[in-house]
Structure formats: structure tokens, C-alpha cells
Amino acid sequence: MPSDRSKNLLLFHFIVLLFGFTSVLGALISISALPLVLYRMGLAAFGLALYFLVFHPNYFYLPKHLWSKVFLGGIIIGAHWVTFFYAIKIAGVSIALSMMATGALITAILDPIINGRKLLGYELIFGSLTSVGIGLIYQAEFKHIEGISIALFSALLSSLFTILNGRMVKIGRPITLSFYELFVGSILGLIIILFSGQFTIESFELKDLDIFWISILAFLCTSFAFNISIKVMRHLSSFTIMMVISLEPIYGIILSLLIWNEKEYLSLNFYVGFLIVISSILMSGIYKLKKEAQKK
């Protein structure tokens, strides 16, 4: 019989496959990044609220001491999705996803700092290798330097969100945390777009299959996937979570190549750099697992 950890790990791989599909959806949907994220978070929060009202009204309850953390989580995840989809819009799926692969490295560095543990030597070694890969990607796709930089910042936000939620799920109901983070993120995003003077009816106007794609993005790839991803954090470490998320670029890039073919093809150096990033992250994870096994 597989252990609870193995079941949760397998489930999370499926969730990451859905996350990989969001990058494709982001490219398929015609509206810009901020309205897209508002639709995504707003509809996802609405779907969870409807589920609570019909089946579990008590799920609306959130302990007072978690409110400030949930508020911060909503800001971080909203900013992460806006920067991620913006990077896709200006640089393409492959470039945005290649930078998201650095999330495990960023977590390996930030987690010890935030949680007060010693930074391990092997994390620095594999981190340096990852930096070499990122350097190659920057050099190979210099014309997309803005998109690369924004996607890298998005990976940082994703890492911070994972570490923050890794703490909260130990004391809060995952689906409740999901709802309030999505709700906070959508409200704050709406306030920003209203007061920035950028709000127009046209920016929220959906064309052709946009409604269909946004529905999949909001309900399947967000309400469902977001809740499950937080739930498995009770059984998996922040580093393991980010290790699996590092496979998202592989899923997403394969999907984008299948859908758009040569449009998403990039230079040889890009793929060499991407391979170095993925390899160093996977080797880091394998090494960490071996070290943990030796302690038992």
C-alpha cells in the first residue's frame, strides 16, 4: 500500500500538470494580464463560496490570528499570477515557464532564512548551477530580457507564497485558506485597476472562446487545483512542493510546442540553459532525499 506521502505526491503531480496547462490558457485568452487574473481569482472565489453555502457553511470561519497572514497570501498570489501571465504575454510560454523552474532554488535559499535554519552547502552548489542556466537563457534570449526578469520575480513570489502557506496549513483548513486568499487577491486587484485609471470596459471584454478558457482556468485550474495544492502542504515539505512545481515548465513547454509548433521554438542556448536549470533542481532534490534516507 502506498504511504500517505506517496499518494499526496502523486496527486500533486497531477495538480502541477494542471498548473502547466494554465500557461497555455494564458496565451489562448485574449485579454491582458491584470483583467485575466481578476477573472481567474474572482470566479474561483465565487465557485468556492457557492460550494461553502450549499454544502459546508462552517467553512467560512477563519481564526482571527490567520487574517493578516491570509491577507498577505492573497496579495502575494495575486501579484504572482499577474506577473506570470504578463511575462507570457510579452515573452511567450517557454520563456516564462523556464524562469518558474527556479522556484525550488529560491525556496531552498529563502526557507532557511525565514524559518531560521542553516543554509546547506549542496543547496548553494546546485543554486550556482541553476544561475549558470539562467545566465545562458538571458544571453540566448536577450530580446526577451523584460519577460525573463518579470518571470523570475514571479517565481520569487511563488516561493514566498509556498513558504507562508506551509506554515498556515498546519493550523487552518486548506479550502478556507484558498477561498480567502483568492477573495483578497481579487478585491485588491480590482481596487488597483480602478484607482490606476486603467479600467475600461474593453479591457474586460471577452472574445470567441475566452469564456470557455477562463471557466477552465478559474474552476478546474484554480478552485480545484489551488485547494488541493494547499491541502498537500500538510504532508509535503516546502522544498518538495517547489521541486514538483519545477516540473511545470516541462509540462507547459511540451504542451505549448504541441499546440503552437514552431511559434514556441527558441534558440539552442535557451534549451541548454533550461536543461541545466531543470537538471540542477532535480539533482538537488535527489541528493536531499538521499540525505534524509541516511538519517533514518
What are the functions of these language-model segments?
Residues 7-14, 35-51, 123-128, 149-150, ...:
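Hydrophobic alpha-helical transmembrane segments of multi-pass integral membrane proteins
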Residues 96-102, 165-186, 222-258:
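Helix-helix packing/entry segments at the starts of transmembrane helices
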Residues 48, 101, 119-138, 267-288:
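Hydrophobic transmembrane alpha-helices of multi-pass small-molecule transport proteins
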Residues 52, 102-125, 250-271:
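C-terminal transmembrane-helix exit sites in multi-pass transporters
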Residues 31-79, 104-107, 157-164, 179-197, ...:
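Transmembrane alpha-helices of multi-pass small-molecule transport proteins
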Residues 55-94, 100, 136, 218-236:
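Specific transmembrane alpha-helical segments of multi-pass solute transporters/efflux pumps
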Residues 1-38, 44, 75, 79, ...:
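Glycine-/small-residue-enriched transmembrane alpha-helix faces in small-molecule transporters
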Residues 41, 210, 246-296:
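C-terminal-most transmembrane helix of multi-pass membrane proteins
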